[in-house]
Swiss-Prot record:
Pathway: Cofactor biosynthesis; adenosylcobalamin biosynthesis. HAMAP family: CobQ. This is Cobyric acid synthase. Keywords: Cobalamin biosynthesis, Glutamine amidotransferase. Catalyzes amidations at positions B, D, E, and G on adenosylcobyrinic A,C-diamide. NH(2) groups are provided by glutamine, and one molecule of ATP is hydrogenolyzed for each amidation. SUPFAM superfamilies: Class I glutamine amidotransferase-like, P-loop containing nucleoside triphosphate hydrolases. It comes from the Bacteria. Residues 248-439 form the GATase cobBQ-type domain. The active site is at residues 329, 431. The gene is cobQ.
């Protein structure tokens, strides 16, 4: 089990790389995360929903993403509450106190999934969540040492040296653990190191002498990996390329408080002809060719935030001067006349006025749509698209008579989304639009980039997984690691 001294220490990436190394060796391997809290998710082969990081790890392992890989997923809907997803299905919304009381039930689901994986795979790389040293969460912990103790799983601690204080992180975390938990820790991995590793050796020697546990490797800072993020936005909000493209398309995504599935935009960030930028609250929206309203886990709340920022006026001006707008999932719902939440699915019951630019309305429902889809964009050339739907809501109205996509095969195609009468606005429930090369190029051409190149985002991701695995093979003491974890 890979546990971290902090969130974003590199647990997800390390598990992905280790899964790829095991796959190379011919080992039947699976990733596993008992509990994840994330708004980036993926649809599984069994029709459920798991954290995006576990879907990436499944790709690394060469297996289909299944709900057993992440049996408990928490999707925050507010600062104090989250939607609780068990074995891929939304069960309820709970606040933090109520979920703490529910944890024994959730843990049963965790152990059921783990037992099934044990029966099917030779090796399982387990990923912890946050830090095992959160004293206030130790009671009823199911994500870190609580799980490791229950199934007798060895643990490796990883820390991010790029943040500073790596030795304090490791020794401090260890000191916060019980004696039995400390004995479960087999060693340390130091992640994201820059510079001459020989200068780090005195610190490594001190750490090993202090704790009696080995340093299993120092992993360098890897720039330019194209891998799906678990939840956090990338630290570099702007991705501009200097490859000499004659025409760059400027794309902006406003960062809403409950933004979800921002992995939709990874392919755009990697595109050599796209100048991409996330814009946070309090920041002016720069001039752009295309503004994309992303998915949201709280559409009424994010609509209110959008208006409070004055972004509705910015979008209106953008359209008035000929700009293009795409709304994806929650963003699509915002573009309509209203969003009704009669059951309080995403907050207090009520109805919120939409932006009103497309003639349809949405009612949020208790049932969630979860499915992988294929089809064709309603753009020149009808390019193929493959993606997925994750939403709680039904949308109806005349604007849907001019759909943005047709999903399914030609004999049983059904419409999705809408394109405005003036052709400036495109709305869809489908995530992953830009991952398909032809669809991405067609959407960029629609937005004004007539000579858009096709880039193969899945191939870029695969190359990054291979590079990650090569790096781990070089910088981890794999014989010592595998001996330590048994």
């Amino acid at each position: 089990m890979i546990q971290g001294t902090t969130s974003d220490a590199g647990k997800s990436t390390l598990v992905a790389g280790l899964c790829r190394l095991a796959r190379r060796a011919g080992v039947r391997v699976a990733p596993f995360k008992p509990q994840n809290m994330a708004l980036n998710s993926a649809v599984t082969v069994d029709g459920g929903e798991i954290g995006r990081a576990q879907a990436l790890q499944a790709i690394a392992a060469g297996i289909a993403a299944h709900t057993d890989l992440n049996p408990v997923l928490l999707k925050p809907t507010s600062d104090r509450g989250a939607q609780v997803i068990i074995h891929g299905k939304a069960r309820m919304n709970l606040d933090a106190r109520a979920y703490h009381d529910y944890k024994p039930v959730a843990f049963e689901a965790v152990l059921e999934s783990y037992a099934r994986l044990q029966a099917a795979y030779e090796t399982i790389f387990v990923e912890g969540a946050g830090s095992p040293a959160e004293i206030n969460l130790r009671d009823r912990d199911i994500a870190n040492m609580g799980f490791a103790e229950a199934v007798d799983c060895p643990v490796v601690l990883v820390a991010d040296i790029d943040r500073g204080g790596v030795f304090a992180h490791l020794t401090g975390t260890l000191a916060c653990l019980s004696a039995s938990e400390q004995s479960r820790v087999r060693g340390f991995i130091i992640n994201r190191f820059r510079g001459d590793v020989s200068l780090l050796k005195p610190g490594l020697d001190w750490l090993e002498a202090k704790t009696g546990k080995p340093v299993l490797g120092v992993v360098p800072y890897l720039h330019g990996l194209t891998l799906d993020a678990e939840d956090m936005l990338p630290p570099e909000l702007r991705a501009a390329h200097d490859g000499g493209a004659a025409r760059m398309l400027r794309v902006v995504v406003p960062v809403l408080p409950h933004i979800s599935n921002h992995t939709d935009f990874d392919a755009l960030r990697a595109h050599p002809q796209v100048d991409f930028e996330y814009v946070r609250s309090g920041t002016p929206v720069p001039p752009a060719d295309l503004i994309i309203l992303p998915g949201s886990k709280n559409v009424p709340g994010d609509l209110a935030s959008l208006r409070a920022q004055g972004w509705d006026a910015v979008l209106q001006k953008h359209l008035r001067y000929g700009g293009r707008v795409i709304g994806i999932c929650g963003g699509m719902q915002m573009l309509g006349r209203e969003v009704a939440d009669p059951h309080g699915v995403e907050g207090a019951p009520g109805t919120s006025a939409g932006l009103g630019w497309l003639d349809y309305s949405t009612v949020l429902t208790r049932d969630k749509t979860l499915k992988n889809v294929t089809g064709h964009l309603a753009l020149p050339g009808s390019p193929e698209v493959a993606g997925y739907e994750i939403h709680m809501g039904e949308t109806h109205g005349p604007a849907l008579d001019t759909p943005a996509l047709r999903l399914g095969d030609a004999q049983a195609a059904h419409p999705d989304g809408a394109i405005s009468a003036d052709g400036q606005i495109l709305a869809t429930y489908v995530h992953g639009l830009f991952d398909t090369p032809a669809a991405c190029a067609a959407l960029l051409a629609w937005a004004g980039l007539s000579d858009a190149e096709e880039i193969d985002y899945p191939a870029l991701r695969e190359a990054s997984l291979e590079r990650l695995a090569d790096t781990l093979a070089e910088h981890l003491d794999l014989p010592k690691l595998f001996a330590a974890i048994g």
